[in-house]
Amino acid sequence: MLNTSILNAQQAIPLYDGELPNAKPCNEKDHEFIDTSWMKSGILVVDHITRPTITVFEPPAEKRTGTAVIICPGGGYGIIAAGHEGADVAKVFNEAGVTAFVLRYRLPKDECMTHKEYVPLMDAQQAIYFVRSHAPQFHIDPNKIGIMGFSAGGHLASTAGTHFNPVRNELANANLRPDFMILIYPVISFNEDIGHLGSRDNLIGKDPDTKLVHLFSNEEQVTPKTPPTFLVHASDDDGVKPENSIRFYEALLKNKVPAELHLFEHGGHGFGLHNTTTSEDWFKSCINWMKANKLLP
């Protein structure tokens, strides 16, 4: 049973009890800072994560809907943008009655882990398991637990939404399928023509095996069992090509998976909650989509 004082304080909860799977000794220490190079107000950046955590943001009791979302911030698998793609998003979900969990997943590094290409997925699956197994404590419906990701966090979320087989044998009997996905300017593909090669290099290496490229090109992994998905992208995104979202959407349609895609004309990459080039609020559209799919009342 989790300590309610920890939950109310929005304290980071260790993702694993005891020894970290796939970890090996290294000199890195957890580190975060405010980066002002990208925007004047600065963004919260985490560039070293040795102990993955999950932080719960609970809505007021009178607003609870029983729906939950696990949020994976982006950062090219080299950093995590923990503020505008993490905590800020969790807080607006709370206003809609959704319990939100911000995941600080391990960043793939050969010197700190074995089989680095599977470690972020391992952490995402552990987060899904954690939330489902603690659903009563969080007043959550175990059948309304989704995963959300921005940029490379969208790659991780879409990987979790297309790869249900457990990375760890310890979770062999667990239900690791998210009930829905929300993907915001996501990296989807690792193929040369549209893939984000920085994310690919960090996760599977600069000269990857073609089998790994296929495995982690999630537009090629969609099946009828893939969960309903809401996608947002900007047409002028020169960081992660909009074809990532378009091809994933096409794969969802082909497999008759409920899906909705919002393509802005402008907005670029990394706008978080606020695409300032338009009056359209993608988050409101997302909430409406969740209601239409009976994920929210």
Where are these regions (language model features)?
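Primarily recognizes the serine-hydrolase "nucleophile elbow" in alpha/beta-hydrolase
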Residues: M122, Q126-G195, V213
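Mobile cap/lid helix-loop segments that gate and shape the active-site cleft of serine hydrolases
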Residues: F33-M39, P186-Q221, P227, K254
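Catalytic nucleophile-loop/oxyanion-hole region of alpha/beta-hydrolase
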Residues: I80-A82, A87-A90, Y105-P142, H274-D281
